Amino acid sequence: MKENAASRVLFILLLFLFASLLNGQSPPEKPKLIKCRSPGKETFTCWWEPGADGGLPTNYTLTYRKEGETLIHECPDYKTGGPNSCYFSKKYTSIWKMYVITVSAINQMGISSSDPLYVDVTYIVEPEPPVNLTLELKHPEDRKPYLWIKWSPPTLTDVKSGWFSIQYEIRLKPEKATDWETHFAPKLTQLKIFNLYPGQKYLVQIRCKPDHGYWSEWSPESFIQIPNDFPVKDTSMWIFVGVLSAVICLIMVWAVALKGYSMVTCILPPVPGPKIKGFDIHLLEKGKSEELLRALESQDFLPTSDCEDLLMEFIEVDDSEDQHLMPHPSKEHMEQGVKPMHLDPDTDSGRGSCDSPSLLSEKCDEPQAYPSKFHIPEGPEKLEDPETNHTCLQAPQSTSGEGKIPYFLANGPKSSTWPFPQPPSLYSPRYSYHNIADVCELALGMAGTTATLLDQTDQHAFKPSKTIETGGEGKAAKQSESEGYSSEPDQDMAWPLLQDKTPLFSAKPLEYVEIHKVSQDGVLALFPKQNEKVDAPETSKEYSKVSRVTDSNILVLIPDLQAQNLTLLEESAKKAPPALP
């Protein structure tokens, strides 16, 4: 019995369910959110489209939450925006916040929810259409008539505060036309329309759009009637230009017809014929080139010639090897000053390349013929720094026959600057000066050469004036014994004839600090500070007066002359070596 009762109840329930299905009752369909719109970024409204209710009463609920929050809120106002809408007032509106909105449909059979809609109020702004649209025809005196359109921004849009800016779009057309003429007016509230058709009735509409958002709806249509006498275009200027152009063209055609040849000649002048003197056109036409060239040659035309034919090529041969290895002796007496008589004849003839220092060193290694007699004092003497005065020691000394002057005073700077081979046994001590002339005078022996040099260069320079002394007089310097140069037996070098017993260097260093005379060729005539004897070393001589500077920037030093110094200089002049023949 119990089993029969349970089966009966289940059967009854199935009958009721089948009956309900036959009556069309079911859960509601899923609703759809259409859009959300904000008129001015302060409030916004959302609309949805409901689905089938399933034959039962259905309730719709809009819920939302802000991005980053978990709390779900229900729509605050279902009535302000109309049916199936939700209105958010300023209290519930936030800028730069994302809203997640969902609509749910509920009845007795079940519940259905829409897909979520993500809304940012900044980008859903859709303002109301502009208001107060005004149309008016203007007839200014100085310009053409036009249609003046004026409007006002939407009431719910705060444009004056600068919250956002609005762009406008105006469209108009004749009443019976199908296409609209569109004009764009950014941030303006008025517009002028020209070139309207007279006698037509125009329809005008306007809409607006914010910087970020959507275009508003078109405003209601406005009408205006254009009168029949309304000028469309000002063609008077074009008519005047056309008439003037036609007149100018007619005048030009008439002038060409009357004076065609003269005008063509003026515009395109003829090419002038050839006017070369002696040029015969007939000879050129006949092809007789020889006669034509003969005619040209007879008209004072200079014959052409190759410039290279006029040049003479020559080679200057210079085989004088000893001329550069040995200095040239002076040939004039140096009465008015020490002047070099020898001038190098080398004037860019290729001798410079042959007289290179490396080549001269090779030439000096070869055996050469030197003057007949040469005396070298005994006893070699090593120097402290042989590089300081190698210039004079490497060059053989020579005295002129008349002036008794070393060769470095008679030759130019070129003959005495290149190195000569130096025997390893020849050395000279370092002195307190490094002048070339001073060192060379020491090489010849200061005892005999200095006086001769002073007597031969300028005897008028012995008048001392305002002697300047840099060192104290009478100071004795201890010096070692003089040592001469030792000559090697296999070298037969040409040196001037010196005294047999005269040492090559003084026993004590000579400090030349006073100049007697400088010649025009840069030769120094030096005076010692005090006269000294070669055989008996005495106090050092200090030179402190400059006599003159030669053309070659060589100083002539004069000592503080005293009576005993003059006597010693005269004695040394008498002992000077005789001149070589």
UniProtKB/Swiss-Prot annotation:
Its main location: membrane. Residues 1-24 form the signal peptide. SMART domains: FN3. A motif (WSXWS motif) lies at residues 215-219. A motif (Box 1 motif) lies at residues 267-275. Expressed in all tissues examined; liver, pituitary, adrenal gland, ovary and fetal liver. Residues 323-388, 462-492 are annotated as: Disordered. One of its GO terms (molecular function) is prolactin receptor activity. Glycans are attached at residues 59, 132. Zn(2+) binds at residues 211-212. One of its GO terms (biological process) is positive regulation of cell population proliferation. GO terms for cellular component: external side of plasma membrane; receptor complex. InterPro entries: FN3_dom, FN3_sf, Growth/epo_recpt_lig-bind, Ig-like_fold, Long_hematopoietin_rcpt_CS, Type-I_Cytokine_Rcpt. CDD domains: FN3. Residues 25-237 are extracellular. Keywords: Disulfide bond, Glycoprotein, Membrane, Metal-binding, Receptor, Repeat, Signal, Transmembrane, Transmembrane helix, Zinc. The keyword Cell inner membrane does not apply. The chain crosses the membrane at residues 238-258. Gene3D superfamilies: Immunoglobulins. It is found in: Membrane. Belongs to the type I cytokine receptor family. Type 1 subfamily. PANTHER family: CYTOKINE RECEPTOR, PROLACTIN RECEPTOR. The WSXWS motif appears to be necessary for proper protein folding and thereby efficient intracellular transport and cell-surface receptor binding. This is a receptor for the anterior pituitary hormone prolactin. This is Prolactin receptor. It comes from Ovis aries (Sheep).
